Regions:
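Short pre-active-site segment immediately N-terminal to the catalytic Zn-binding motif
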Residues: 1-6
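Catalytic Zn2+-binding segment of zinc metalloproteases
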Residues: 9-27
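Metalloprotease/metallohydrolase-associated module, dominated by Zn2+-dependent proteases
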Residues: 30-111
């Protein structure tokens, strides 16, 4: 489980680096649209909890969070196959698992 959350946070570092490179005019390996969405999210970051400590559902639908959860879950699924015990936000439904499967297929094709 710790590996899962490390992967999630490492993905945030990657996102941030892509935003930094894009802003500096450097070539990036991520589509411009994704980077601009990440930049928007970082500039108006929504916290996971509301003032009353209740869960803020909007947090989970930021592009940076969806991407980080998909990446970390897909990496774990690719490596370990059975990942039923990993945390998936209840806000996510089939669209999340469809995105994960697409990433796992990319990993398969690349022979990682």
């Amino acid at each position: 489980m710790i590996e899962y959350f490390f992967l999630h946070e490492i993905r945030h570092y990657f996102q941030y680096q892509m935003v930094e490179d894009y802003q500096a005019g450097k070539e990036t390996i991520v589509k411009k649209q994704h980077i601009e969405n990440w930049q928007k999210d970082y500039n108006s970051y929504i916290l996971p909890n509301n003032q009353d400590a209740s869960t803020n559902d909007e947090y989970f639908f930021q592009s940076i969070e969806i991407d980080a959860f998909v990446y970390s879950y897909a990496t774990m699924k690719y490596k370990y196959k059975n990942v039923d015990d990993l945390y998936v936000p209840k806000q996510y439904n089939q669209f999340f698992y469809d995105m994960v499967d697409k990433v796992v297929n990319i990993f398969d094709k690349q022979g990682l």
